[in-house]
Amino acid sequence: MEQIPFVSSAPNTLGIELELQLVDPRSFDLAAASDELLAQLANHPIADRVKPEITRSMIELNSSVHEHPAGLLAEMREMRDVLCEAADAVGVGVTGGGAHPFMRWQDRAISDTPRFQYLAEMYGYLARQFTVFGQHIHLGVPSGDAAVRMVRGLSPYVPHFIALSAASPYCEGVDTLFSCCRLNAVNSFPLAGHMPADVTDWYRFEAHLAQLRASGLAESIKDLYWDIRPKPEYGTVEIRVCDTPLTVERACQLAAFAQALAVQVARDPEPSQQAWLAYRSNHFQACRFGLHGSYVTPDGQRVRLVDHLRALFDRLAPVAEELGTGDMLQTLRDEILRNGNDARWLRGQFLKVRELPLVVESMAQNWRGQGVQDTPPSAVRRRIRATSEPVGGVCALSTPQGDPLPGWAERLH
């Protein structure tokens, strides 16, 4: 059995990847402009942190590695501004969000790289439907065994990440009734899901991958579309279930949440095998209903996800204070419990403007850090409407009461 080397990283370090939408600034449909944008950035210092994605209407923005989410936020704001300036120069807009509200998968063009061309040939139309946009959060760990333990410890909290980040209620011009429809595209792939429950250490992980290779089911770890997976060449654990948020501020808040949770689960007893029993059901509830979903705890209790999340924020508060991230976690908690997630915001925007291109226009404004302005709409009036799920009252969610580091920085792209 082939051994897989694991590059040791400093614990509690973090970095993120953001998959971003490229849009036409008049119609606000997706624009196949990644080649032009990458060429525009070719001589810029951030050029090696902006990568093509599977279709030409996408790019991936990669951070360096940080000890503290405040340093991450400063870097992401700087890269966002550079990216928007370059996008303006080539005549495209950039937005966050987990799915474009009205794009047609048939119109997508596959990026011209060997891996993406292979995926298109292997998976057919699924490759074009994979024009969805996620945030991946990387957490540094010292060893393969530590990585497997962290994957197991974080797995019961996958629904919390989904609900916090959900930003894909619309697909191909209709309200899907899901808070996060993006993961339905991800789950179409045969090796999607979670790390097998019987993988309890790095040796068993190596053995599992060896079995997949021997059976012709996978060639590398890249073929494992797990919700959370080890990334041995980076020395990280990679959380892959988050929709790309509408702002870099929310993206960095989610990274701070992940960092604090990783510290907490390292101190907690490892979840029992029973924790895997409701994994798929919990996953569905978070995708479909977001914060309003139900959640079955590792010990079998059925609760409201928002109540469990509120209690989790309270439990993480002392850890966040230790890490110096208390303000970021408190801001995330307050904004989520008061206003809901980005999916709720997008539905609220649709109720105001009544046309999905105008929703995308507001997404582009948010990404730039401008907020939504009360200015006359500029989108070409392609009439694309969607029946919107009732937003509901915010009170339903309310309670009554630094610098880049060496190491895997240069590998995170």
UniProtKB/Swiss-Prot annotation:
<dbReference type="Pfam" id="PF04107">
    <property type="entry name" value="GCS2"/>
</dbReference>
<comment type="function">
    <text>ATP-dependent carboxylate-amine ligase which exhibits weak glutamate--cysteine ligase activity.</text>
</comment>
<feature type="region of interest" description="Disordered">
    <location>
        <begin position="392"/>
        <end position="413"/>
    </location>
</feature>
<keyword id="KW-0547">Nucleotide-binding</keyword>
<dbReference type="InterPro" id="IPR050141">
    <property type="entry name" value="GCL_type2/YbdK_subfam"/>
</dbReference>
<dbReference type="InterPro" id="IPR014746">
    <property type="entry name" value="Gln_synth/guanido_kin_cat_dom"/>
</dbReference>
<keyword id="KW-0436">Ligase</keyword>
<dbReference type="GO" id="GO:0042398">
    <property type="term" value="P:modified amino acid biosynthetic process"/>
</dbReference>
<dbReference type="InterPro" id="IPR006336">
    <property type="entry name" value="GCS2"/>
</dbReference>
<dbReference type="GO" id="GO:0004357">
    <property type="term" value="F:glutamate-cysteine ligase activity"/>
</dbReference>
<keyword id="KW-0067">ATP-binding</keyword>
<comment type="similarity">
    <text>Belongs to the glutamate--cysteine ligase type 2 family. YbdK subfamily.</text>
</comment>
<dbReference type="GO" id="GO:0005524">
    <property type="term" value="F:ATP binding"/>
</dbReference>
<protein>
    <recommendedName>
        <fullName>Putative glutamate--cysteine ligase 2</fullName>
        <ecNumber>6.3.2.2</ecNumber>
    </recommendedName>
</protein>
<dbReference type="InterPro" id="IPR011793">
    <property type="entry name" value="YbdK"/>
</dbReference>
